[in-house]
Regions:
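Active-site beta-strand/loop signature of hydrolases that rely on acidic residues for catalysis
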Residues: 6-10, 25-43, 105, 135-157, ...
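Structured beta-strand-rich core segments of catalytic domains in phosphoester-bond hydrolases
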Residues: 38-41, 45-115
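Metal-dependent phosphoesterases centered on the DNase I-like endonuclease/exonuclease/phosphatase
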Residues: 53, 127-220
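Conserved beta strand-loop-helix elements of the APE1-like EEP
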Residues: 64-78, 199, 211-232, 258
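Surface-exposed cleft-lining segments at the edges of enzyme active sites
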Residues: 84-86, 111-128, 164-169
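Surface polyanion/phosphate-binding segment centered on an Asp-His-Pro turn
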Residues: 237-264
């Protein structure tokens, strides 16, 4: 294992957020970056702009919605999967997987599920079940694996400024939380929560009601590490400064630092 910084960032629209993305990449220089909510077709992906600052990329776009990408600094990701197994009729661009710098990286954008109850929440739970089934084999792999992305789940009340305002939201429903816990029960390590078991860390601040200014946040962007990778976890955090920039996404990049030696 070599030292690596791996990040996940829901950009909430690649076209609108490209200057913010480039500024973050140049300042923080993650070795691997998983992006969600590109909201653009494949032909509009800014591969040349990313290559100009040293990043190779693979992507799966979708007009107006969804879309995921994996970036690699001074490298080209080697794609291994596009979409989760279990539903050949699912055309939404939500999962992309590649080998990068010796790590198998799964970049995911889990369905939001609102409004609930209803078909969107049912789709969220069905997608989650497919992820859980597929993740089991990845968890058991002898190769290092990270599942990084916007899970659209607030795991516990510690991960939100005030759960009372969100009780009816799909992100906090018992079914959503149970699915996330089932993932962890397979043996995945929630990197931020492992290093900061009691801290209120947020990755998302709604645009409305001055949530950023009041630090009324949610933690819904997660990096899960399998047992082959988790011993190398050295540090983790949130680049909250990105959320304070003009024309910012409502998410901030979340990252982990891996060491070349085991820490546990």
């Amino acid at each position: 294992m070599k030292k690596l910084r791996i990040a996940t960032f829901n950009v909430n629209g690649m076209r609108a957020r490209l200057p913010n993305l480039l500024a973050w990449l140049e300042r923080e220089q993650p070795d691997i970056a998983c992006l969600q909510e590109l909201k653009s077709v494949d032909s509009a992906f800014p591969a040349a702009e990313l290559e100009a600052i040293g990043y190779g990329a693979i992507w799966q776009g979708q007009a107006s919605w969804n879309g995921v990408a994996i970036l690699a600094r001074d490298a080209q990701p080697l794609e291994s999967r596009r979409g989760l197994p279990g539903d050949d009729g699912d055309s939404q661009s939500r999962y992309l997987e590649a080998a990068v710098h010796g790590v198998l990286v799964g970049c995911l954008y889990l369905p939001n599920g609102n409004p609930q109850p209803g078909p969107k929440f049912e789709y969220k739970l069905a997608w989650f079940e497919r992820l859980i089934a597929y993740a089991k084999d990845l968890q058991c792999s002898e190769h290092p694996v990270v599942l990084a992305g916007d899970y659209n789940v607030v795991p516990t009340d510690l991960d939100i400024y005030n759960p009372r305002s969100w009780l009816k939201d799909a992100l906090l429903q018992p079914e959503s939380r149970e699915c996330y816990q089932r993932l962890l029960n397979q043996g995945w390590t929630d990197a931020l929560r492992y290093l900061y078991p009691q801290d209120r860390l947020y990755t998302f601040w709604d645009y409305f009601r001055q949530h950023w200014q009041k630090n009324s946040g949610l933690r819904i962007d997660h990096l899960l590490l399998n047992p082959a990778l988790s011993p190398y976890l050295q540090a983790a955090g949130v680049d909250a400064w990105v959320r304070n920039e003009p024309h910012a996404s409502d998410h901030a990049p979340t990252w982990i630092q891996l060491d070349s030696r085991k820490h546990r």
